[in-house]
Structure formats: structure tokens, C-alpha cells
């Protein structure tokens, strides 16, 4: 499994997990977050590996569809980049202005 896909699925899962069924959440968490194999998940839930595989593939598509419609993750990434640029600009241009730094920190806390 490639790392980029794993990271993306984990990120999408963080944003949209509450929209999934309990079984979808459990399978995705075990597979992506806990690095369980299909066989281990199948054994845990007493189902076939194929059933686990199908469920995970369906759930991946569902997560991608949610992102395509809602853009929560992509908007988060853009906001994070802008915030980093703002922070760098303030640090270079207004290094002694603690008030601006405080506001940036508050925004960062909201984003996390």
C-alpha cells in the first residue's frame, strides 16, 4: 500500500468518519490507522477477506465522493498553507508585534 494513499485516506477519514456506518468506520480504522491486513480484519469480524476488501474499496470511494462534494480536506490544506505564509510574513515584517502572533496562534488552534 502506498504511503500517499494511506495518508490521504487517513485524512479523509478524519474529516468524514462520522458519515460512515459503524462497520465502515471499524474496517477503515483497522486497515489504515492500525495497519491490519485484510486477513486479520476478516478473522476479527468472522467474514471473508473478499468481504473486507469490497467494504474498504466501497468506503474509499464514498470518502472520495464526500470530499468531491464538500471539499473539507482540500480547503483545510489550502487554509493551512495560507496560514503558514501569513505566519512567515508576519515573522519577517512584524517580528515584534505579539498581538498579530497571538491572533495567528488562535487561528491555528481553531484549525487543529
From Swiss-Prot:
<dbReference type="InterPro" id="IPR036388">
    <property type="entry name" value="WH-like_DNA-bd_sf"/>
</dbReference>
<comment type="function">
    <text>Might take part in the signal recognition particle (SRP) pathway. This is inferred from the conservation of its genetic proximity to ftsY/ffh. May be a regulatory protein.</text>
</comment>
<dbReference type="Pfam" id="PF04297">
    <property type="entry name" value="UPF0122"/>
</dbReference>
<protein>
    <recommendedName>
        <fullName>UPF0122 protein EF_1701</fullName>
    </recommendedName>
</protein>
<dbReference type="InterPro" id="IPR013324">
    <property type="entry name" value="RNA_pol_sigma_r3/r4-like"/>
</dbReference>
<comment type="similarity">
    <text>Belongs to the UPF0122 family.</text>
</comment>
<dbReference type="InterPro" id="IPR054831">
    <property type="entry name" value="UPF0122_fam_protein"/>
</dbReference>
<dbReference type="InterPro" id="IPR007394">
    <property type="entry name" value="UPF0122"/>
</dbReference>
Amino acid at each position: 500500500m502506498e504511503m500517499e494513499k494511506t495518508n490521504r485516506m487517513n485524512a479523509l477519514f478524519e474529516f468524514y468518519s462520522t458519515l460512515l456506518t459503524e462497520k465502515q468506520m471499524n474496517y477503515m480504522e483497522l486497515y489504515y490507522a492500525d495497519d491490519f491486513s485484510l486477513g486479520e480484519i476478516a478473522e476479527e469480524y468472522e467474514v471473508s477477506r473478499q468481504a473486507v476488501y469490497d467494504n474498504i474499496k466501497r468506503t474509499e470511494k464514498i470518502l472520495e465522493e464526500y470530499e468531491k462534494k464538500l471539499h473539507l480536506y482540500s480547503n483545510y490544506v489550502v487554509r493551512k498553507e495560507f496560514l503558514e505564509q501569513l505566519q512567515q510574513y508576519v515573522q519577517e515584517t512584524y517580528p515584534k508585534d505579539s498581538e498579530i502572533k497571538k491572533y495567528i496562534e488562535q487561528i491555528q488552534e481553531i484549525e487543529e
